[in-house]
Regions:
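Trp- and acidic/polar-enriched beta-sheet ligand-binding modules for extracellular glycan
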Residues: 1-12, 84-88, 98, 109-186
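Phosphate-coordinating loops and pocket residues in cytosolic domains that bind phosphorylated ligands
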Residues: 105
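Disordered, acidic Ser/Thr/Pro-rich linker "stalks" and the adjacent N-terminal cap
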Residues: 4-6, 10-96, 108-121, 142, ...
Length: 186
């Protein structure tokens, strides 16, 4: 039996029905879902990218760097000349419909150590939307994450879609630029 001793003011309890509403958040100690093969993925669209290559790093700043499986490259929204602030978004075409349970977002590493996240620019708050046709979109999650090299986020309910869009609405240290080194789905 469950005994409810008290509830917070925003959690309604119906005395006539004897019903209580409980919200329980759980976590996984290890990810139980299989990674989705990214060999057929492509970047369908993006809000902005840095069009000029950084010396010695031809792909840094380009949107396709977010799915190139190379943690040393990254999608960086424009930082030379124009410096548009969030929201920044990237749309990925997985090539076919997939069952989605969550995502791993790898932020840009500090330039001097690959295990430490850059202090600013990595996603802090972002939305995930999915679509079957790249026209009608459904929001499947809004996430707030810490500044880690990798953040794993889980959807409340699985979703099936061909396309997904990640929209970063706030970055670490509230920087104008967004940096994502790698996006994986599971």
């Amino acid at each position: 039996p469950i005994t409810i001793e008290r509830v917070t003011p925003d959690l309604p309890v119906s005395p006539t029905l004897g019903t209580a509403y409980l919200r329980i958040n759980g976590t996984y100690t290890t990810n139980p879902f299989r990674p989705i093969d990214r060999s057929g993925w492509s970047v369908e669209a993006f809000s902005t990218e840095e069009p000029e290559a950084q010396t010695g790093y031809d792909d840094n700043g380009k949107a396709f760097s977010a799915i190139d499986d190379a943690p040393c490259t990254y999608w960086g929204t424009q930082w030379r000349n124009a410096k548009p602030g969030p929201p920044h978004w990237i749309t990925i075409d997985m090539g076919k419909s997939e069952e989605l349970h969550g995502f791993t977002i790898r932020g840009r590493a500090d330039p001097f150590t690959s295990d430490t996240p850059k202090a600013s620019g990595n996603p802090r708050i972002f939305n995930v939307d999915v679509s079957d046709d790249n026209a009608s979109w459904t929001r499947v999650g809004t996430f707030t994450v810490e500044n880690r090299i990798e953040n794993e986020v889980y959807l409340d309910h699985k979703a099936t879609a061909r396309y997904f869009r990640i929209t970063v609405t706030a970055t670490q240290a509230d920087m104008y630029q967004t940096c994502i080194a790698d996006i994986k789905a599971f």
